[in-house]
Amino acid sequence: MPPKRDPRFNLGLISFSGLIEGIAAGTIFISLPYSVSSLPEGELFSDWAETSRIGFLISSFGLAMFFGQLLAGRMARNIAPRRSIAITGLAACAASTALLVLAASFPQLVLLRIIQGLSLALVIPTTASLLTAYSGPSSRGSALGFFSSAKTLGLALGPLAGGILIGYFGKENLGAVYGLGAGVILLACVPFFFLPSPGLTVNPGGSPGKQTDTSQPNQSSRGSPLFNPGLALGAFVAASCATTLPVFQNEFANRLGLDSFGIAVALSSMLLTRFLVSWPVGRAADRIDEHRLIYAGLLFLAGSTFLLGLAVSFPVLLLARIIMGIGMALFSVPALRIVSGDPESRNHTFRISLLTAAFSCGVGIGPLLTGLCADRFGFVTPFICWSLLSLATAAFISSRQRKTEASTSGAPPGGKPDLSEVSEPVAAGRKTTG
């Protein structure tokens, strides 16, 4: 029987893979608008403005991830070990990234981004499920926050690396950037080969032991619904707010006189801030009600998105993106912690995939709506709309939470609340008193 390994080592492997993949994704992401500008539009998109084509490219990737994550969540219920799904997704993403070198028109670029989205969709919910399987109930928020920090650091460093590479090779030689990105994504597969099958979990004391039930004493797996509409709407809106800058990347560059490295700094600033904040937020989510953090995150997103639309200088643009990074961390880590309860449940990965798919739906539809809104009503309008939607989403989640508390407080003395009426789970892994 092989010796039991410290689960923190497994968490480190997964986080290292996320860091590497994030660097590659960020490098590719900043390069794509330049490909859109240089490649022929194709007959189908000949009447589309460049901004609309960039928005459509981002949307196609996000929608592919949306549908792919629903499939990945279902696959993880029947395929073991789950790490094989992640390896398959990363390998397919590397292949499609390498093929970007051969893209000769905008439609081909869209097709390859769809394949990339479907490939990465296999990785995201599977990775989150593995993280919760390797972490204990009292440290689940910290584990998710640490991985989020590592992945976000990669996404932040990626645009910086991409800006440097584009400056070195030139905008006419993006094939070198895509080729390097494909190689880095393949490297991200390696840590998964060293992961054991996720049959062990960590008890609250932090030592490995046999698999235990980490659900709450008064809460079965049915107490965590498969779909949480409030958090799903929040994920959609958060992603839409975060993608406003990429949609107007070229416009901001022209308005503020920024080169490719300046845009890279603006893109990375949100991600670097999220990197710094995610782990502390995860630790806080292990100790206080996650909803308080979620409300704060949506308020930060509303203010930063509005400020971004009014940016008339690079410092204001940078400040808006930094505030947005804080908001993204305050929303995403606690929301993921809420849906990651009951790791032994057969629907665990699928429940996570529904939240991550909602975020990908925002990445997919949000930029398209942003571009269309700007074309019809002006540049500032989409920023105002997403700000108001962030505030409305916070109010919606708060309303649902109050209804949940009212229904649970109405349970008979000494009895249990009707779990079918509980719309949102109690903070996963936290002991309750009855």
Language-model features and meaning:
Residues F56-G73, S268-W279:
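Central cavity-lining transmembrane alpha-helices of secondary-active solute carriers
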Residues A182-G206, T393-R402:
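C-terminal membrane-cytosol helix-exit motif in multi-pass small-molecule transporters
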Residues L122-S135, L330-P343:
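Intracellular juxtamembrane helix-capping segments at the cytosolic ends
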